[in-house]
Amino acid sequence: MILKGCLLYPLCSPRNKQRCARLWKIAYGGLLKIVTGSLLTFYVVLCLDGGMVLMRKQVPSRFMYPKEWQHLTMFILLTLNGCVDFMSKNVLPQRCVGLEKGTLVLIIYELLLLMVSHVKDSEGVELHVYSLLILVVFLLLLVLTAELWAPNMCHLQLMETFLILMMGSWLMQAGFILYRPVSGYPWQDDDISDIMFVTTFFCWHVMINASFLLGIYGFSSFWYHCFRPSLKLTGPKEAPYYASTPGPLYKLLQEVEQSEKEDQALLLPKSSP
């Protein structure tokens, strides 16, 4: 009876399976990009007291807040990238990976152009920090461009993951260097040791991110080689329990059901007045 109940009432109903499948197909990465880009966009717009004014009213007219407008453009691009990912995975009838990759490459191209012009009035430590960031963005652009013609090369995908990790971690490090130094004292542009340590920190980021990726790859490889063979061996043994074709277990269940019906038929005359 226990086996029969397990077969007739499975743990996951078809409705729950369909719901889990729909949740699994949601582009969470795209939603995260949309939410993050939107929040940062609102932050840039609201952080200025006078608002995002494009040009001042005095004569001669000049553009105002050039860096803030560049930040706003970057965050809007991030939001648009998330919208494209979400539409490709959840709105279109069939996912278009080429559209996602092409949009990402175009956005990285624009990001590189914005970064190059972003450092025009920078110097010292700030210029060095942004130069290293531009180097990472440029290498990422090359890898993404190569992926358009070779989308299934695992080496390019690994390099893409590493460079995205580098860009994210170095952006956080740049925030601490330029705006909130850990020591509490601002970095000195005229001190050569500060500029040298910026490069040292960048090399540390390279080693940490590479070790992080290597650890994930090593753990995944270990898990695959240790547990994958056992799954392959136990898979065919469990298959007959879920098959609909008649087998020994199916015949046993029929015999149990028939015996229960006979017992009930014998009990009915005794219980009747």
Curated annotation (Swiss-Prot):
Keywords linked to the UniProt accession: Membrane, Transmembrane, Transmembrane helix
Transmembrane segments: 34-54, 72-92, 96-116, 129-149, 158-178, 195-215
A GO CC term attached to the entry: membrane
Name of protein: Transmembrane epididymal protein 1
UniProt main location, coarse: membrane
Family membership: Belongs to the TMEM45 family.
Membrane topology: Multi-pass membrane protein
Source organism (scientific name): Homo sapiens (Human)
Keyword Transmembrane helix assigned: yes
Annotated localization: Membrane
Claim: Electron transport is one of the keywords in the record: no
Domain of life: Eukaryota
